[in-house]
A protein has these predicted regions:
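Surface-exposed peri-terminal alpha-helical interaction modules
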Residues: 1-145
Length: 145
C-alpha cells in the first residue's frame, strides 16, 4: 500500500516537472510537437494518481497502525480537498481542444496545484520514513559511532 502511495505521488510530481518544461517551450497547441502529445498523457496519469489518493492514504494509515491516527485523518481531509480542486483544474485543461504552453503555465501557477504538490511532498516524506525505518536506524547508529 505504501508503494502505491509513493507511485501515485511520483506520477503527479513527474507530471508537474513535465508541465514546467512544456510551459517554457511556447507551444500554441499540443499538436505542435511530440511534447504536445505527451502533455495529455502526463495529465491523464495525474488524474488517475489523484483519484482516490486520500482514501488510499487513510487505508494505509489504518493498516500500518500509525499512532495519532486522528492527525493523519485530518491531514488526509486536506489532501482530499486539494486533490479534488486540482483535479477540477486538470480536467478543465484536458477538456480544451488545444493545450498551449500558456495554458499549462497557468495550471502550474494555480494555488490548488501548488497546495497539492506541497501535500504530496509531505506524504512522500512520511511514506519514505515508514517504508525504510530499519535503514534509518542502521544509518543513525552508524552516525553515532
Amino acid at each position: 500500500m505504501l508503494a502505491e502511495i509513493s507511485n501515485r505521488c511520483n506520477a503527479v510530481e513527474e507530471c508537474y516537472e513535465f508541465m514546467l518544461a512544456y510551459a517554457a517551450q511556447g507551444f500554441r497547441s499540443d499538436r505542435d510537437s511530440k511534447s504536445g502529445g505527451e502533455v495529455r498523457d502526463f495529465l491523464h496519469r495525474a488524474v488517475t494518481a489523484l483519484t482516490g489518493l486520500a482514501e488510499t492514504c487513510a487505508l494505509a494509515a489504518k493498516q500500518e497502525g500509525l499512532e495519532s491516527a486522528e492527525k493523519y485523518l485530518a491531514f488526509f481531509a486536506v489532501l482530499d480537498r486539494d486533490a479534488r480542486d486540482s483535479l477540477a483544474a486538470i480536467e478543465l485543461v484536458l477538456a480544451q481542444p488545444a493545450i498551449s504552453s500558456q495554458l499549462i503555465d497557468n495550471l502550474n501557477a494555480s494555488i490548488h496545484v501548488r497546495a497539492l504538490l506541497t501535500d504530496l511532498f509531505l506524504v512522500s516524506e512520511i511514506v519514505s520514513k515508514h517504508s525504510h525505518p530499519a535503514a534509518e536506524v542502521v544509518a543513525s547508529n552508524s552516525n553515532e559511532e
